[in-house]
From Swiss-Prot:
This is E3 ubiquitin ligase TRAF3IP2. Residues 409-550 form the SEFIR domain. It comes from Homo sapiens (Human). Widely expressed. Interacts with IKBKG/NF-kappa B essential modulator, with CHUK/IKK-alpha and with IKBKB/IKK-beta. Interacts with TRAF6; this interaction is direct. Interacts with IL17RA and IL17RC. Interacts with IL17RB. GO terms for molecular function: signaling receptor binding; ubiquitin protein ligase activity.
Amino acid sequence: MPPQLQETRMNRSIPVEVDESEPYPSQLLKPIPEYSPEEESEPPAPNIRNMAPNSLSAPTMLHNSSGDFSQAHSTLKLANHQRPVSRQVTCLRTQVLEDSEDSFCRRHPGLGKAFPSGCSAVSEPASESVVGALPAEHQFSFMEKRNQWLVSQLSAASPDTGHDSDKSDQSLPNASADSLGGSQEMVQRPQPHRNRAGLDLPTIDTGYDSQPQDVLGIRQLERPLPLTSVCYPQDLPRPLRSREFPQFEPQRYPACAQMLPPNLSPHAPWNYHYHCPGSPDHQVPYGHDYPRAAYQQVIQPALPGQPLPGASVRGLHPVQKVILNYPSPWDHEERPAQRDCSFPGLPRHQDQPHHQPPNRAGAPGESLECPAELRPQVPQPPSPAAVPRPPSNPPARGTLKTSNLPEELRKVFITYSMDTAMEVVKFVNFLLVNGFQTAIDIFEDRIRGIDIIKWMERYLRDKTVMIIVAISPKYKQDVEGAESQLDEDEHGLHTKYIHRMMQIEFIKQGSMNFRFIPVLFPNAKKEHVPTWLQNTHVYSWPKNKKNILLRLLREEEYVAPPRGPLPTLQVVPL
């Protein structure tokens, strides 16, 4: 037989388990590349698997090809997809495979006694006789088949059932197909799964259920939980509680026990850092099961049915809510008053002056009626810039409404005396930032210097201008005193002239007040109001600042509900 055709039979790589204890290096099993210029110059041959003859015509092909070298050389090129192997390496590989088979049979004497019934119809002695009768090439092919069957028996007896347990079984058909060239040989392909219950094919999911037989007992283990569980509120982080300040008991000190409503919402617009004066800075937690002593000092929101401070209760549901704009950061006395007006839940004594900020001059715990030994240390009051504005959309307090007052109805004129000059400047600034064109003499001194009388009469004769009277002890003295006492006080004379013009208009209107608004400034009392103005609403600054804005906006503080249909009467015959 030509050596080229024998090399064609011997050059395929077959996965065979080799005994590592044998003194044969593994490098001998690797094919040594031998390049031929004739083979590289020719185009690649088609796949020999679709053209290979069956096992019956194999000997005939061998005898025919032995006589013609050119025909054998063409068959070599068709069947050889890999590089040629030398004859010496092929013989060494055959010897290694035979020695490995003998070593395997010595270690496993029970496995080599007989072939399975599905693989061959002959027994062990018969197979040895067949091997002896075949030529050298067929003996090597038969030994390859037997080694493949031994490897399949070893993989079937292996206890490993993991993901890689089926790879050896699946590789056997591929190796057999490569060695046979896609055709049936003298010895049939072994069936390694005859003694196994079923195929352990891996599933698509490689998780906990990917092993059908569950050898390691993975299915009996508990599945791991997520790192953070949102199903259990007790696992959420708790708020920080200060240890420096003692907690107050609501049963013992009712004034301090301002509890939150039962349905606490972390997204409520009032859920900001509004605190009682002098109280520690407690953050409102979002846990529902946290002890309620943690938020005893948080101001609760204004609920429907609670009247606004400083307003006369004329109804049950206040709807008109004024959101104030503060003019400048140096206004230190108006911003604490905003907290008093915006949040009715803030406790305050009845006899506390309306213009005095809470706890500004006294101890921080006086308005809370707490014992002195339980009061916290005196903290610094929050700066005016740090006090946040009230929420623009408080819940359950009506709908927001933007006033559409025209520009000609936003003009305001203020008459005052010199003892309230500084407070009047703050009041004018407050009206300006809230959209009103406010005029006083010190802001229009250049225009006023042209003609003082005409400047005053321009606002007095215009019926659309609202006139605010700043009541003070000096104002009562200026308007009711003798003119001889005002000879040296030019401002007092102008105040007396304006008062007389207003009184004449009031009489002409039938003693009805349409545009005069008396406002009590600090250190003023009700008896300082002129007699003809006492039969009207008298406001206080800065206590009733929202009511003053509502009066200038021509809006009511309380709005009646819409009228419904008449009730249905049921007539019952006698």
